[in-house]
Amino acid sequence: MTDHALLLVNLGSPASTSVADVRRYLNQFLMDPYVIDLPWPVRRLLVSLILVKRPEQSAHAYGSIWWEEGSPLVVLTRRLQAAMVEHWPHGPVEIAMRYGQPALPEVLERLAAQGVRKVTLAPLYPQFADSTVTTVVELAKQTVSERGLPLQMRVLRPFYDHPDYIEALAASARPYLEQDYDHLLLSFHGLPERHLKKLDPTGNHDFQAADCCKDAGAEMRAVCYRGQCLATAKAFAQKMGIPDGKWSVSFQSRLGRAKWIEPYTEARLDELGKAGVKKLLVMCPAFVADCIETLEEIGMRGSEQFVEAGGRELVLVPCLNDHPEWVRVLADMCEKA
């Protein structure tokens, strides 16, 4: 075995559906300053308030989608890992989670102990955000530095508009899009608008604009999560030949009362149901593996909401998961990282 490892990193999951495990996971996740970007005392107070009721609610939600093998996100990421092995001849292929297990610092330490000296770090997030990509990269760097690990790292950059990534999305979604449907909703994970504003070098960018940062400079486009989501959606729609008016974009998973990027998925589901859309397809391209946000939030609660608003059927298009075309594309992008 050679000394160059591929490390696939995803968000993470509770160890089980117990309230205690969910509380422990939510505490680690929400206390990350890249997730809730408030001063520590304020963040600690806010998270403590959230943890009064949220763990029980989330435990129920996780229980509704939990598989016999465990968390869908972790199981699917392990399947991706297994498929990637034959495409990565340079050394071991491992997975790590930013929150929960297998923990990123421990995986890095284990790789170093095995004689690995180079790591290609692949945050499994197509679009850039501090709360996803940056927190993974910074924790990896901090771990290597503080523990004195003899590891050289290179990082897979966000690939939101990479033609091969768009092709993989198309290949995985095509069987669903070849069926009759009325509308396609591309629902991305949302972010507080302030997360984007603090990265705006101009200070005057309009994060509600329909084309967002399309005409902004390269510096802004590299960090504008909303603009990257819109670019993914547009490239996908063009690839599939979906006419304007038959697809739209929204942002899900809003937490708290702060202003998040819009339009909100909940509002869009109501609008589409009331507008006469009967069969709605929903894709979630911010996620490469199905998880609670896709399976429960959209596939269950979102479906109920859409039907209550007048729709007939919501069909959740699976994420890329371990689709063969995605495996090939990811391996190629990691090879060139």
From Swiss-Prot:
Binding positions for Fe cation per the UniProt entry: H189, E293
Protein name: Ferrochelatase
Molecular function as annotated in GO: ferrochelatase activity; metal ion binding
One GO BP: heme biosynthetic process
Homology family: Belongs to the ferrochelatase family.
Its EC number(s): 4.98.1.1
Top-level division of the source organism's lineage: Bacteria
Organism for this UniProt entry: Pseudomonas putida (strain GB-1)
